[in-house]
């Protein structure tokens, strides 16, 4: 009996309309689609597709793709996804680049190990573009921080990568043992390629910035939380600095259990976790000068009341925060108050959420030359001991699953093939990273198996309806 003819090929415009409706909160779908064939890859990597994709989802907030961190454990990838399916981004090697901030489609890193001068690295997670920014030697200190923001006038900040940006660098220096310490901030402009005027203020206390990232309120006010609990305000327009204290500790809080956030009205807020509750504060200024902290909302957390719950990060644009318990890391969407377990608690101290609409880019690999990391990625280094043995066995299992998936394809058992490729893909992405060449064939086979599985289901449905 002759085999049935293949189904007709869908027109390109119909394929594009289908791909446009893949869910933004599961970016792995678009990435896998880009590996199915050259036509699909050309469609989803075209700038026109990205504009339409973002426009189609203009009424929803951009999703949290994952987070960056500075925890020194080579078993944990530099970028940890929070999405449903396997997904990865080629983040800079955190052995050398400490993540500081992420905003408006750009992430900022600091390199300060064993050099006389520090250096910043700007990375666009979606395009993969990188740019190094030298930091003046006079700014060098132990624990500085920095913030990045889009500098394009009138930008809606939903797709502003590649445009002008600004960086604010904040640091503290002890002038002498008997004098106050000086906290300074300086603004860098990508349009001029230069640092601006240095603005400084003397305080009785030193400010180190290791465990918290910044928050941008409106278009002109940046806030930084020091490790000691003081909040530093920087005015982008005037360059003025101001420092003030966080909310009162009537609830028995401590500095390492709260973090900065945006309040419901768009102003400055603070989230802190006390026992099994999330306490949300906002800063109000009735006359523009005398500001005070006001309790905004209390969210009940469905966790053990004896568990320590530090607030690790706030996702600007997505209105979500990260908290950790003894065993797990959770992301809480503040509007719905829904909590989602992200991963195990690996001892993270600071998280930098990456918030953006994802579409595959034609330039996925890091270019060679000046934008390359100063050392090869962790997955290219030789590993020994128990960890090396475990990873070798995991990769052998991935190959076995891949071979079983190929055999299932030949036997037209597409459901089993998709399961095999999915498990193999999870192992290889965890080891190599989602954009590594070692994962490309698995992505391709997995996407093909899913398409065949869906086509088979559609054919069965058509036969039943007849």
Spell out what each predicted region is:
Residues 394, 433-439:
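Helix N-cap/loop-to-helix boundary motif
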Residues 451-466:
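Short coil/linker segments at helix-helix boundaries
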Residues 1-379:
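N-terminal entry/capping and adjacent linker segments that precede and initiate structured domains
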Residues 425-429:
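Amphipathic alpha-helical segments of tetratricopeptide repeats
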Residues 385-399:
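TPR-adjacent "capping" and linker segments in tetratricopeptide-repeat scaffold/adaptor proteins
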């Amino acid at each position: 009996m002759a085999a049935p003819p293949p189904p007709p090929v869908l027109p390109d415009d119909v394929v594009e309309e289908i791909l446009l409706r893949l869910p933004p909160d599961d970016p792995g779908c678009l990435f896998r689609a880009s590996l199915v064939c050259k036509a699909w890859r050309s469609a989803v990597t075209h700038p026109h597709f990205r504009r339409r994709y973002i426009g189609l989802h203009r009424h929803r907030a951009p999703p949290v793709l994952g987070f960056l961190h500075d925890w020194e454990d080579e078993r944990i990838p530099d970028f940890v996804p929070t999405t449903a399916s396997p997904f990865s981004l080629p983040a800079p090697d955190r052995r050398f680049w400490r993540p500081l901030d992420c905003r408006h489609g750009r992430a900022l890193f600091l390199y300060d190990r064993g050099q006389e001068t520090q250096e910043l690295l700007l990375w666009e997670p979606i395009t993969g573009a990188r740019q190094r920014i030298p930091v003046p030697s006079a700014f060098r200190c132990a624990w500085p921080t920095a913030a990045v923001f889009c500098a394009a006038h009138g930008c809606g900040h939903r797709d502003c990568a590649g445009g002008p940006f600004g960086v604010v660098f904040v640091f503290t220096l002890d002038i002498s043992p008997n004098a106050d310490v000086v906290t300074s901030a300086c603004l860098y402009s990508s349009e001029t390629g230069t640092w601006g005027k240095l603005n400084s203020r003397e305080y009785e206390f030193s400010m180190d910035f290791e465990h918290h990232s910044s928050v941008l309120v409106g278009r002109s006010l940046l806030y930084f939380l020091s490790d000691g609990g003081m909040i530093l305000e920087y005015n982008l327009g005037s360059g003025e600095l101001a420092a003030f204290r966080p909310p009162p500790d009537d609830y028995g809080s401590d500095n390492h259990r709260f973090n900065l956030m945006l309040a419901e009205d768009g102003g400055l807020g603070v989230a802190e976790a006390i026992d099994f509750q999330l306490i949300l504060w906002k800063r109000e200024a009735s006359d523009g000068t005398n500001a005070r902290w006001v309790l905004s909302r209390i969210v009940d957390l469905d966790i053990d009341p004896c568990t320590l719950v530090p607030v690790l990060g706030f996702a600007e644009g997505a209105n979500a925060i990260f908290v950790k318990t003894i065993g797990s890391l959770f992301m809480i969407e503040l509007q719905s108050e829904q909590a989602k377990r992200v991963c195990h608690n690996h001892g993270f101290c600071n998280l930098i959420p990456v918030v953006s609409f994802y579409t595959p880019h034609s330039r996925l690999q890091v270019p060679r030359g000046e934008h390359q990391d100063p050392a090869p990625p962790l997955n290219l280094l030789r590993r020994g001991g128990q960890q090396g043995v475990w990873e070798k066995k995991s990769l052998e299992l991935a190959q076995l699953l891949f071979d079983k998936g190929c055999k299932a394809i030949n036997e037209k058992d597409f459901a089993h093939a998709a399961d095999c490729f999915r498990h193999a893909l999870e192992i290889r992405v965890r080891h190599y990273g989602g954009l590594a060449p070692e994962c490309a064939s698995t992505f391709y086979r997995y996407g093909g198996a899913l398409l065949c599985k869906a086509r088979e289901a559609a054919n069965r449905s058509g036969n039943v309806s007849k």
